[in-house]
Structures are given as structure tokens and as C-alpha cells.
Amino acid sequence: MAEIHNGGELCDFMENGEIFSEHSCLNAHMGTENTGDTYDCDEYGENFPMLHNSAPAGETLSVLNQCRKAFSLPPNVHQRTWIGDKSFEYSDCEEAFVDQSHLQANRITHNGETLYEQKQCGRAFTYSTSHAVSVKMHTVEKPYECKECGKFFRYSSYLNSHMRTHTGEKPYECKECGKCFTVSSHLVEHVRIHTGEKPYQCKECGRAFAGRSGLTKHVRIHTGEKPYECNECGKAYNRFYLLTEHFKTHTEEKPFECKVCGKSFRSSSCLKNHFRIHTGIKPYKCKECGKAFTVSSSLHNHVKIHTGEKPYECKDCGKAFATSSQLIEHIRTHTGEKPYICKECGKTFRASSHLQKHVRIHTGEKPYICNECGKAYNRFYLLTKHLKTH
């Protein structure tokens, strides 16, 4: 069993990695000393160390070596779960329990009683330890400070993971491709790219995701939730990075410049995607037809042509679309909204991509260059048409 301490940090039991939420188990976890006293188990021939803590006065704890769980009663009580003995029966539901405390908890459930109430959130708990955990969550106790940036954390393990952002350490390596990660959970999600496993499925449209965070973000499309709001204009977004990009529209900040054509971008990722226009690199390839794309989002949208998936439906006319951006653009045909304005001539557009193409008329930008003869065009379809002449 992992070291048990009274420092406020919750740790798990190393034998099986479980973290226990039951009253007795949590008390055992928070115990501080081994008294040296033991209970003898006649059934398994094991000795059980007696623990004690500073929680309820006089309460003693013991650990059952057979399954490595900790309990506030002698091991013989827990042994009933191993031999099937349930001596305490509740008449209302005819359910049997191995000890008096579980019987009491069941009675409380039927009677609707709650012994411990959390004032901050109004939640009520049957066990005092569950209440104690809730209190800790509300007090947001963060005793672990990063000496590099001053950020505080609730657990030392969180601080350890955070420190890797400063040191650059990435100890978790993918055996398939060699990519490294700062935390194990990121590696677990990444590995699913190779295995194709997507255990998190959207109940609305059936789309599946490799990670829980991906599903959480996706669900906002259906619920309309936009938790990230701009303090300047009140505009809200369902992704934090979209809010970050939006902030730059107020400052007109575009710090990332293309060395080939001089065009500036708000983020390094936008510059990276743009640069592929010049290099011709298209790393994202469709497994169905072989078509390649410069950005992953374009491939993702393209794949829906093969699957026929159109999860985004217009509530006004019922027309369905493969992407949320296509739906948003379509809705503007009903509302007449054209939020994208050309600063040169005042012409308005429904989509930002339409504005971008239009602006090239004023700037003379021709980013699509023929590798054969060097002739350049402001539209990709014009370059495609030209290539046929060669």
C-alpha cells in the first residue's frame, strides 16, 4: 500500500491503483501511523495492521491484505464479502448488508435523509468523508507552488506535471512513431490515432472521439454552449483558441509573417498552413480516394463526402451540411447577414474565405505559383486550369 499521510493530498493504493470513496476506505487513506497492533485473520492466515487517524475520536482502522482495501472495522467484517455473509437485512427493500454502517446508509437512502450538508454547493452526503472531500474541492486548497512562474496546484503530482512545461521534459514516448508527451494521459489519447480506437461517442450525431476532451468540445456544437466570451465586444466562442484568435481582431496583431510572400498571420499555425501553399506539401491524405490536403480539418471535411455524413442541419429549411462552418454560412442566406467587410471598397461577404479571395484583387497577391513556368494566380482553380496547358 502507498504511504499514508495526513498532508491533505489524496493518493491511491499502489497494489491495484484504486482510489476509494467509501467512509472507511478514505479514513484509512488519511491515517498517519501504524500502531503495531494487528488483527489475525483465521480464514486466510494473515495479520492485519491496525491504523489510526485524527478524524473521529477513538476510531480505528485496519487493512485487509487479501484485497488491499482499508476499513474502519476489524477485518472480520470485511471478510463477510469474501465468504458471502450478509448478516444485516433491511426490511424496506429486503437487501442484505455485511455490516451495520452499510445498513444505516441504505436506510438513509430510503428515508431521504442526509447527514452531512455542504453549504457552498448545497449538496448533501451520507458519509462524513464524502462531505470532507467536497469541502476540500470548494476551499480549493493549493499548497504546491511552481518556483518558475508562481502558479499554485492542489496536488504535488499536478505540480510535477506542470514543471515539465518549463524543463521541456517529455517522458512518455509513443512506441509507434516516437512522439513524446509530458503526461501519460496525452500519450494514451495519441496512441488511439494508431489503433483507430474512439471510445467516446456523441449521443446526438454518433460521431466518435479518441479523447474525452474532444467529445466535450464537440458537444458544444449541439448544445450551442459558448463559454469563452470576449470582454471587449461580448462575442462568445465554444473553443478557447477561437477566442484567442478573436482577441487579435481588436488589436489587429499579426506577428507571424511569411518569408516568401510577406503575408502576416495571427498565429503560427495559420502561417504553417499557409506556407504549404508555397511548398506544395499536403501531408493529410484520404485513405478512400488518395486526395491530399494541406490541413487536417480539410481532410476531415472531405472524408464526409465518402461517408455521406451531414450532422449539421438548418432549422429553417432542413438542409444538412457536413461541417458546422458550412451550416453557419448557409444560415446567413436566410438572415442576409454579411459580417465580413473589405476595408478597401466596403464590399461585404458571408464568409471570411470569400473576403480573403476578394482582397487579393486590391493587394495583387497571387499565392498559387506554377512550378513549371513560374506563372502565378490569385485563385487555386486558375492554377489548376493553367497546369493542364503543360
Swiss-Prot record:
Zinc finger (C2H2-type) residue numbers: 88-110, 116-138, 144-166, 172-194, 200-222, 228-250, 256-278, 284-306, 312-334, 340-362, 368-390
Annotated InterPro entries: Znf_C2H2_sf, Znf_C2H2_type
Chief location category: nucleus
GO molecular function, one term: zinc ion binding
One protein family per Pfam: zf-H2C2_2
GO BP field: regulation of transcription by RNA polymerase II
Listed GO CC annotations: nucleus
Presence of keyword Iron-sulfur: no
Subcellular location(s) per record: Nucleus
Segments traversing the membrane: none
Keyword tags: DNA-binding, Metal-binding, Nucleus, Repeat, Transcription, Transcription regulation, Zinc, Zinc-finger
Family statement drawn from the similarity comment of this UniProt entry: Belongs to the krueppel C2H2-type zinc-finger protein family.
Function: May be involved in transcriptional regulation.
Protein name: Zinc finger protein 121
